């Protein structure tokens, strides 16, 4: 923890830990409080979803932890809206990140620590593999990421869950503070809990320590994804981009290999803040662009995606709002 905080440059004046009340995030708060660099203040951010009957008790436990550590606790209450085309897990996660960003703005915090650990990382890789994710998805969770103007740090991605639980037991024995238990963590109706309770035990029995191997795989995928992204960026720069990257040369794009065409399209869409399409949808756009006649002008090409329109005119491919 101390090494992760020292690596921040410039050193932040304020840090926050996202704390649910469970053992993982609570012990991250304990570790952060112990390793806090001079001149830096710490806060605990708690998001109250109201999804569990014990949600009020969880909030009270977080306040108790804050009092124990001498750290202020800030709470945001959110309602997880149904029917966004997301499952309950994904909808709650989205609401949680939005609430954390709001708390960060309110308190002038730029960096938030998250308690994801090696076992979480391994579960994420397995889930994404089973869902058929691509290279970037197989990189799983990054030690550092930015979202909504907030820098999220995951200093425990290489820490085994057993070590965290051992620390929680020591804190309970010494201070009497008890972490809450989220019943969804072991409810197999939820995908992650199904991996944790049904798949992981079989892997533990056959391949002890498999989480470290899978986490290493995620790091390797992250490196490969970074290389692919750099190649895509370099390729796109050769496509004669114009109008702040809104358009590029169809003829130049056609000069790329099929795999690099697809990556250049992904880079282009991401640079224009367009949601990333599925592999099938992207393949359809690629097919249409490759089949346009040589002049690259086809008024019938209107590939629509997430409120945006891709069109081709005078040999250039455009994206419009």
Curated annotation (Swiss-Prot):
In short, the EC number is 6.3.4.19
Task: Give the domain of life.
Answer: Bacteria
Predominant location category: cytoplasm
Q: Where in the cell is it found?
A: Cytoplasm
User: Which SUPFAM superfamilies does the annotation name?
Assistant: Adenine nucleotide alpha hydrolases-like, MesJ substrate recognition domain-like
Q: Name one GO biological process term.
A: tRNA modification
Name the family.
Belongs to the tRNA(Ile)-lysidine synthase family.
Q: What is recorded about the protein's domains?
A: The N-terminal region contains the highly conserved SGGXDS motif, predicted to be a P-loop motif involved in ATP binding.
Main function: Ligates lysine onto the cytidine present at position 34 of the AUA codon-specific tRNA(Ile) that contains the anticodon CAU, in an ATP-dependent manner. Cytidine is converted to lysidine, thus changing the amino acid specificity of the tRNA from methionine to isoleucine.
- Please identify the protein, giving its name as recorded: tRNA(Ile)-lysidine synthase
Q: Which gene encodes it?
A: tilS
């Amino acid at each position: 923890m101390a090494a992760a905080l020292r690596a921040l440059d410039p050193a932040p004046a304020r840090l926050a830990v996202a704390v649910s009340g469970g053992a993982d995030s609570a012990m991250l708060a304990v570790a952060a409080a112990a390793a806090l660099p001079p001149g830096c203040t710490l806060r605990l951010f708690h998001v109250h979803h109201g999804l569990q009957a014990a949600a009020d008790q969880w909030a009270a436990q977080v306040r108790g932890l804050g009092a124990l550590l001498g750290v202020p606790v800030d709470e945001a209450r959110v309602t997880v809206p149904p029917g966004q085309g997301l499952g309950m897990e994904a909808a709650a996660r989205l609401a949680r990140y939005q609430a954390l960003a709001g708390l960060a703005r309110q308190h002038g915090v730029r960096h938030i620590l998250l308690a994801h650990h090696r076992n979480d990382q391994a579960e994420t890789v397995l889930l994404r593999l089973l869902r058929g994710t691509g290279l970037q998805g197989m990189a799983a969770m990054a030690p550092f990421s930015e979202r909504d103007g907030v820098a999220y740090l995951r200093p425990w991605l290489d820490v085994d869950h057993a070590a965290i639980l051992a620390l929680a037991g020591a804190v309970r024995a010494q201070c009497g503070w008890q972490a809450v238990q989220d019943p969804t963590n072991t409810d197999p109706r939820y995908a992650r809990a199904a991996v944790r309770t049904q798949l992981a035990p079989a892997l533990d029995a056959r391949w002890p320590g498999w989480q470290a191997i899978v986490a290493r795989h995620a790091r390797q995928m992250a490196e490969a994804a970074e290389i692919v992204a750099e190649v895509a960026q370099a390729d796109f720069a050769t496509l004669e981009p114009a109008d702040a990257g809104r358009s590029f040369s169809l003829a130049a794009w056609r000069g790329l290999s099929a795999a690099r065409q697809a990556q250049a399209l992904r880079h282009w869409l991401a640079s224009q803040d367009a949601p990333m399409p599925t592999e099938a949808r992207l393949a359809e756009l690629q097919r249409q662009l490759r089949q346009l006649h040589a002049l690259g002008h086809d008024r019938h090409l209107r590939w629509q995606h997430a409120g945006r329109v891709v069109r081709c005119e005078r040999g250039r491919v455009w994206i419009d709002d």
